[in-house]
């Protein structure tokens, strides 16, 4: 499972280096898509297959499910690392996540996340100021 956060930059062509700690995780290819809180999710292909199964299991008769699938699935793009361990982020996804210049590459369970540094700082600060529901953390052992 990837963990940690690494500051990188995205070049003028929309390429960002994947940190060495995460390269093996996505070496067989990846799917980039819109994430929550304005970031991008980067799933290795094996994880993406599980995500697809979950999306396919959502009821098409539910408007909220359809909207989420549309948001999440329509933004998906297949990618591979180039010879310099970079991934090319499509312009539509860069615009969605406001990626221009500095980028935070963060690990998360089953995926990586690409963040605008200001959005990343705000997301971290929000958790510090208003921790998640205590019931969600009841079994968390620190």
Swiss-Prot record:
Family to which the UniProt record says this protein belongs: Belongs to the MraZ family.
Protein name, entry field: Transcriptional regulator MraZ
Description of how the protein assembles with itself and partners: Forms oligomers.
Main location: cytoplasm
Location of the protein in the cell: Cytoplasm, Nucleoid
Stretches assigned to the SpoVT-AbrB domain: 5-47, 76-119
Recorded GO CC terms: cytoplasm; nucleoid
Lineage of producing organism: Bacteria, Thermotogati, Deinococcota, Deinococci, Deinococcales
Organism of provenance: Deinococcus geothermalis (strain DSM 11300 / CIP 105573 / AG-3a)
Family matches, as InterPro entries: MraZ (IPR003444), MraZ_C (IPR035644), MraZ_dom (IPR020603), MraZ_N (IPR035642), MraZ_sf (IPR038619), SpoVT-AbrB_dom (IPR007159), SpoVT-AbrB_sf (IPR037914)
Highest taxon above the source species: Bacteria
Keywords for the protein's UniProt record, in alphabetical order: Cytoplasm, DNA-binding, Repeat, Transcription, Transcription regulation
Pfam families noted in UniProt: MraZ
Gene3D superfamilies tied to this protein: Transcriptional regulator MraZ domain
PANTHER family: TRANSCRIPTIONAL REGULATOR MRAZ
GO biological process, one term: negative regulation of DNA-templated transcription initiation
CDD domains tied to this protein: MraZ_C (cd16321), MraZ_N (cd16320)
GO molecular function, one term: DNA-binding transcription factor activity
